[in-house]
Amino acid sequence: MVMTDPISDMLTRIRNANTVRHEKLELPASKIKKEIAEILKREGFIRDYEYIEDSKQGVIRIFLKYGSSNERVITGLKRISKPGLRVYAKAGELPRVLGGLGIAIVSTSKGVMTDKEARQQQVGGEVLAYVW
C-alpha cells in the first residue's frame, strides 16, 4: 500500500495509541518523523522515543506519557498542512495553539521546530501540525 501522507499516519497512530492508553507504539522511520518525535519529547508530550535499525528503513518506537492518575498528556493532535492543501506562515504570522498551551510543529529552512523556536529565530515555514 502506498502511503501518501506519512506525517498524518504518524499523528493518527499516536492519537489512537494514546486514546486506548498504550504504553508504546512503533511506526516506520523517516528523518522528519524522528525530528517530530524529538520535538514531542523535548516539549514533554511523550516520555521517550528510540530508533531501531532494521533491514529496511528502520522503526521508531515512541513511549507515550500519562499523568499520575493515568490521564493523557496529549489531549489533541491535528494535521494542518496536507499534501492537497499546503499551509505556510511567515515568522510573524505563526499561530499560537490554545493561547500558548499547545505547540505548532513547523518545517522551516532551518529544520523542523516549534512555533516558539521559529518566532525566536525569525523564520517562517510550513505548519505541519498542532499538538495540545
Curated annotation (Swiss-Prot):
One Pfam family named in its UniProt record: Ribosomal_S8
Family to which this protein belongs: Belongs to the universal ribosomal protein uS8 family.
GO CC annotation terms, alphabetical: ribonucleoprotein complex; ribosome
Molecular function, one GO term: rRNA binding
Designated name of the protein: Small ribosomal subunit protein uS8
NCBIfam families assigned to the protein according to its UniProt record, in alphabetical order: PRK00136.1
Keywords: Ribonucleoprotein, Ribosomal protein, RNA-binding, rRNA-binding
Function: One of the primary rRNA binding proteins, it binds directly to 16S rRNA central domain where it helps coordinate assembly of the platform of the 30S subunit.
Subunit structure: Part of the 30S ribosomal subunit. Contacts proteins S5 and S12.
GO terms of biological process kind: translation
Species whose genome carries this gene: Halalkalibacterium halodurans (strain ATCC BAA-125 / DSM 18197 / FERM 7344 / JCM 9153 / C-125)
Domain of life of the organism encoding this protein: Bacteria
Matches recorded under SUPFAM superfamilies: Ribosomal protein S8
